[in-house]
Each structure stands twice: as C-alpha cells, then as structure tokens.
C-alpha cells in the first residue's frame, strides 16, 4: 500500500515510490536490490540495466541461462554491475575451507553429497508450488546445493542426470541429481519441498571428509581425517 509505505518513509526519512518505473528512472538511485518472486527477475533487471542501475538480486538470479546471458551482455553494454545474493560465495567459512583443501592435507575432492528438505503444506497459490511464479524445489532451494558443488568442484559440471517428482501444479516437488565434471568429480543432490531433511553437505576427499550443517548459512564445519 503506497500510503502506508509513505507513512513509514516519513518516519524513517526514506524515499517511497508509487511504481517500479518511478524507482527505475530516479536519477538519484545508483543500485537496486530486487527481492521479488523469481519469475519477475528478468524483466525488472532489464529495466534497471537500461536505466543504468547496478543490481543485487535474490536467488535464483534468472529462470534459465538464456535470460542470464542476455542480461550479462546488456549490463556490459551499459557499464553496470549485476550480482546474485547467493550466501555461499561470500561466507568466510567457505573461503577457509577452500584454503584447507588447497593445502592438500585432505587430498583431492572426489565426491560431494548434498541434502536440503523442508515440508511445505501444499497450496497451489503459494509461490513454492505456483508454476507462474517459477516455483519448485530447484529454483528455491536447489541453487544453494549447486552453488556449494560449484565452489568445491575443480571445473564446471558437464554431465547431469535428474529424477523429479512433480506437484499437481507441475513444479518439481522433489528432485534427485547426479553431477560430474571432466576431472571425474561427482556430486549427488537430494531436494524436497515435501520431506524434512537436514541442510547437510559432505565433501569427501582422499584423506578425510568435511561435514557442513546448515550450509546455506553455515558458521562451522567438522573436518575428519581418516589417515
């Protein structure tokens, strides 16, 4: 509600806009944080870029690689920066674990096992299950697991197998994935919007393994050396 927002804006001395377009075209705005549902990211990002605004956008940044590729090219043309608010790439714990792995004490990473599950009451209007809002397990929670895998893999995965269980709306309610890269590293992912699972990552190496609990917002990890 614009008038309710206006009242808060007056209290906290913040600018309030009557429309998205008004915000995108405001010359005093340098950067925009986009937190709307996934299906709106592409359109809002494109408008922001064309108005020379830098962007931080919630995951998932876009619905597919074609959308993202177009926006990256457009951002380069307009000399603006776009970034995805993915926790994994910016947390100190992951940088520290990367340092430990690079030291060689654990040996090579061979297998990564990821779990992420929660129970959501089925509601076709809820964004988790609404296809028009780009719902589903992969775009909502799977991106965390894939980001961890990409962080620890030596190269980009070039092979993927998947199996899905779909909700009545057609979105992926549960999913299992098997990924591998050209170096022979493998990863398995189990996702669910209809089953409780720990948010657990296991990084299995030649000389031991790393366990990360609550990996989307991890603050600690357990390292076990088997030699």
Where are these regions (language model features)?
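Hydrophobic residues in well-ordered beta-strands that form the structural core
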Residues: 18, 57-58, 82-84, 212
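Rossmann-fold dehydrogenase core element
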Residues: 69-87, 108-111
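Single conserved hydrophobic/aromatic residue that forms the stacking wall/gate
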Residues: 1-12
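Contiguous beta-strand/loop segments that form the cofactor/metal-binding neighborhood of enzyme cores
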Residues: 147-219
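Structured catalytic cores of enzymes that bind and process phosphorylated ligands/cofactors
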Residues: 31-40, 44, 127-128, 137-149, ...
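Predominantly a Rossmann-like dinucleotide-binding segment in NAD(P)-dependent oxidoreductases
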Residues: 88-160, 168
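Beta-loop-alpha module in the N-terminal Rossmann-like domain of NAD(P)-dependent dehydrogenases
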Residues: 14-72
